[in-house]
Regions:
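Extended, Lys/Arg-enriched charged tracts that mediate electrostatic binding to polyanionic substrates
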Residues: 115-129
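Helix-start/capping segments and mature chain N-termini
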Residues: 1-105, 127, 134-338
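Charged, gly/pro-rich active-site loop segments
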Residues: 97, 105-119
Length: 338
């Protein structure tokens, strides 16, 4: 294992030893290649550079208390990538190929997997890009699918603590029938200005309303939203929201804990009724929300300065499953290193 101060890692890129790649040419995927080079050689007219033909995923490997290394729900990431491929006209990466490459890259870089005690993890980033030259808006004929890994600390520096959010009305992350449900870079580019605006105003993240009516809660930055009231886990239903694997898992955990689950449109005024609220995603798992400000109306929706009891219970349960400390009765984790 590398001699690093695992406990002080930030959520950022660090070079590791290997990445894995697979190329799509002549209508089929080739063999998996192992590479130590951090760089890609790309044609200047590649479709990923001009027409946004790229998709990515994010998942994690955990070094657990029992010494094993587990990966969480990688088949779900494969399925979501396949959905994105269909949406932006790229060849699908089979679940078998996806999972084989995930396991291979984790094993190749096992010295970079943080210690159990540190709270840090190995972040896994699959990336699919159109590589063939194209002038004119058409799908590429050739593609590169690669996966790299990097050890990361908590996404938010304070760890599991509450953060303030702000509703941004002047910007939309995605259109109602656009690419919001796909994990493509363009959605994140569309969020950069609003995210910077939120940070300048002292908030952890921006909160988007639905692009069509500006009435319903959509996404919080790059994460899904949930609210808790009356022992019910409520999360938005929208065609412009990325289907979060973490949120999907939390909905199941909530049911396992005896909570009701509702996935439906959430009007802004309903925020007043929630006892707890949070953002969820692979990076932070759960980021509890202390309050949401609506600067246009002057309204503040408060959920408490500290994480609520149900948010903490959901977080602890899901983390326990990821780390192999709580029974994985849904078969979500895969042991990749014994």
């Amino acid at each position: 294992m590398k001699n690093l101060d695992w406990g002080s890692l930030s959520f950022g890129y660090m070079k590791t030893d290997y990445n894995v790649r697979c190329y799509y040419r002549d209508g089929k995927w080739g063999e998996i290649e192992v590479c130590s080079d951090e760089y890609l050689k790309l044609h200047m007219a590649a479709t990923c550079l001009h027409y946004g033909q790229e998709a990515f995923e994010g998942l994690k490997a955990y070094r657990c208390k029992d010494g094993k290394v587990r990966v969480f729900r990688m088949e779900e990431n494969a399925a979501r990538l396949q959905s994105t491929c269909r949406g932006i006209m790229m060849p699908e990466v089979s679940t078998e190929l996806f999972c084989e490459m995930v396991k291979k890259v984790v094993r190749l870089n096992q010295e970079w997997i943080p210690t159990y005690e540190s709270g840090a993890t190995l972040y896994i980033r699959p990336l699919l890009i159109g590589t063939s030259a194209q002038v004119g808006v058409h799908p590429a004929k050739e593609y590169c699918f690669l996966i790299f890994v990097t050890p990361v600390g908590p996404y938010f520096k304070g760890g599991f603590s509450s953060n303030p959010y702000v509703i941004i009305r002047d910007y939309d992350r995605s259109a109602p029938l656009g690419t919001g449900k796909y994990k493509v870079g363009g959605n994140y580019a569309a969020s950069l200005f609003a995210n910077n605006l939120a940070h300048e105003k002292g908030y952890a993240c921006e909160f988007y309303l639905d692009a069509k009516e500006k009435k319903y809660m959509d996404e919080c930055g790059a994460a899904n939203f949930f609210g808790i009231k009356d022992n019910t886990y409520v999360t938005p239903k929208s065609t412009s929201i990325l289907p979060s694997i973490t949120n999907k898992s939390l909905m199941q955990v909530a049911e396992d804990l005896g909570m009701k689950v509702e996935r439906r449109p959430i009007p802004e005024e309903e925020l007043d009724t929630f006892e707890e609220a949070g953002a969820c995603g692979t990076a932070a798992v759960i980021s509890p929300i202390s309050y949401i400000d609506d600067l246009d109306t002057g309204k503040r929706y408060s959920f408490g300065e500290k994480p609520g009891p149900m948010s903490k219970k959901l977080f602890d349960t899901l983390r326990g499953i990821q780390y192999g400390e709580i029974e994985d009765k849904h078969g979500w984790t895969t042991v990749v290193i014994e």
